[in-house]
Amino acid sequence: MKWHNIGRAVLTGLVGVGLALGASAQTLTSNATGTHDGFYYSFWKDSGDASFGLKAGGRYTSHWTKSTNNWVGGKGWETGSIDRVVHYSGTFGVDDSQNSYLALYGWTRNPLIEYYVIESYGSYNPANCEGGTDYGSFQSDGATYNVRRCQRVQQPSIDGTQTFYQYFSVRTPKKGFGAISGTITFANHVKFWASKGLKLGTPDYQVLATEGYQSRGSSDITVSEDAASANAGK
């Protein structure tokens, strides 16, 4: 997968779509965004049989086969926070031969920035964009994260077709497959990015996303945040 497919996938599903659902478990097979049991969610696919299950609280499930060209979905927060400490656990049902990733994903405005904290990926590292700039690495949550900036020129965004930057923090070593869990102290990423001149703007949504591109797999992920970071956002 080329790195730009990830952004295009999420954007197409998130812009201009709204759907509020109750707290009962549901399985989505059509593109939608909204809130469910206290969490924001997004689901988009361009074809095929990918499905997205809304479960209690911050839990979601997904399943897809190669009949789906590209899909992405996740649960999180309608308004992102630079101070959010995100916890996730569950299963990431892919392997090194499958083109998929698991990441904290979000947007800001003024400046318009698309960002990723990549926790695990399969056959393709989403930060491997052509013409990108590397900004070194830093330590957070028991791992090293490599930082890279990519530019999108006149491509879809939360504000329509725009030119904007993407920031990537890619975990090394990446998390494995199967049972998976971790913590993302997002403030550490924001601080390092800022030290390199990579500024964020006003937060838009922020989700813990699963993505698949011309691959097959499944996920069952529960996302939550520290109480302190939740209160800070109020």
Name the predicted role of every residue range.
Residues 75-79, 151-200:
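Beta-sandwich interaction modules
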Residues 73-139:
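Extracellular-facing segments of soluble proteins and assemblies that are Gly/Ser/Thr-biased and enriched
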Residues 1-11:
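Bacterial N-terminal signal peptides that target proteins for export
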Residues 110-175:
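An exposed acidic His-Trp-rich patch
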Residues 26-78:
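N-terminal segment immediately downstream of the Sec signal-peptide cleavage site
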Residues 10-18:
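Bacterial N-terminal signal peptides
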Residues 20-22:
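N-terminal signal peptide c-region/cleavage motif recognized by signal peptidases
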Residues 178-234:
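Long, compositionally biased interface segments
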